């Protein structure tokens, strides 16, 4: 039997001293929206979590800072991470252009989950999405690797921005600053 766990089960056990916590400071149309803080499931999906963490810090010379949320679908998700083209056709990982699906142990069971966007099996790069509802039809197709810890109201604000055809925000929704946070309570939860 495959070890599939709900996000709720992971959340209650997931975090340990190895938790990476990253943030995005976001603007919409050059006006600050706020900060989203994301916890990464580093023990369950270490390669995927490390890719996202390194792209959030920009430590490899490229990453999320300055990139946009290019696709927003109400009652589904917000998508970003294409820092090379900005339209959903680009991006790259810290491991090269694409990397394999690490595993599908965590299911898309609630809003606020962080998952890899892809163009099919084993095509992970830098694009990601944050769910705004449970999305079980994505289980086994997209790797869940974290969740929103703080600032979900910013995700909701992005979800509700006016859009043009193609689900693109009418005004730019930009990650103006991103990085890694030192968390004082990293050790307060047990991870898998």
Swiss-Prot record:
InterPro entries: Cyclophilin-like_dom_sf, Cyclophilin-type_PPIase, Cyclophilin-type_PPIase_CS, Cyclophilin-type_PPIase_dom. Its EC number is 5.2.1.8. A motif (Prevents secretion from ER) lies at residues 189-192. Glycans are attached at residue 124. Gene3D superfamilies: Cyclophilin-like. Keywords: Endoplasmic reticulum, Glycoprotein, Isomerase, Rotamase, Signal. Pfam families: Pro_isomerase. It is found in: Endoplasmic reticulum lumen. The keyword Signal applies. It comes from the Eukaryota. This is Peptidyl-prolyl cis-trans isomerase B. The lineage of its organism: Eukaryota, Fungi, Dikarya, Ascomycota, Pezizomycotina.
